[in-house]
Amino acid sequence: MVTVLPGGTPQHSIAQPEPADVKPVALDLEGVRLDIPVFTTETRSLKASLIRSVTGGKLSRRGGGAVVTALQNVSCTIREGDRVALIGHNGAGKSTFLRLVSGIYQHTDGRFEAHVPVFPMIHKSFITSSELSGMQAIKAHYLLVHGNLRGFDAFCDDVVTFSGLGDFVQLPVKTYSQGMAARLLFAVLTAGTHDCLAMDEGFGAGDSSFFQKAQERMHGFLATAGTLLLASHSDPLLRQFCHRGLVFSEGSIVFDGPLEDALSYYHHTAD
């Protein structure tokens, strides 16, 4: 196996055989740091943007500019089939960690290897144009995730039926009400199964009349994920779907162990 460190040269290592009862590694992080450069610190709008988008970070000066260290010395190994709770107060680094393992952020230092594709359920909007019709948006998302249209018809039927959009799926997304757009997005992102799912509890269906139906679908969706990373403040939700906990504080993992031990550690230190 060849590992390329950021800004460095390939490092060669001989992979050791795993015991027969140990599942393959899905994600492997060692000493990972994530720095996010700040181009100016003079405007109030940037300050507000930092608060919204960077969690668990420390602002410092480096190389003539400002840098937010969002994650610091993060090390953990997640194996296929692990169901991991990300625990910590707002701003501890949970969402930033999800963005990093999903490929949205690139680490600055340390080693990070993803051996399975990670599907992020973090953003509340499509990475696409609102000029597209609902049908075109569904197809664009499917192509982005799968790289082809094999199995698309069944996927599309499921999305249209569950969202309840009917013929409105042929209209541009920009003509949808907020509730219609939220139902379409939720239906698309919870259709199918994924090898590894990274989910922030803050992701929601956005329509009160749709809530119960969405809750049932979400629980089924989480249950079918092969490997799960779930950031949440709900102990009952974490107990239902996870068996391991990572506790974050100030951009670092401060506890890694069985879920009940992790919850106990977090509540004890948070009091």
State where each predicted segment sits.
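Pre-NBD coupling/linker segments of ABC/ABC-like ATPases
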Residues: 2-69, 266-268
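ABC ATPase nucleotide-binding domain signature region
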Residues: 28, 33-37, 80-85, 89-145
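ABC-family P-loop ATPase nucleotide-binding domains
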Residues: 64-67, 117, 122-184, 188-196, ...
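Conserved N-terminal flank of the Walker A/P-loop in ABC nucleotide-binding domains
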Residues: 67, 74, 82-83
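Helical segment within the ABC ATPase nucleotide-binding domain
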Residues: 211-224
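H-loop/switch region of ABC-family ATPase nucleotide-binding domains
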Residues: 232-233
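Conserved catalytic segment of ABC-fold P-loop ATPases
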Residues: 240-247
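Conserved beta-strand-loop-alpha-helix hinge in the C-terminal portion
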Residues: 252-271
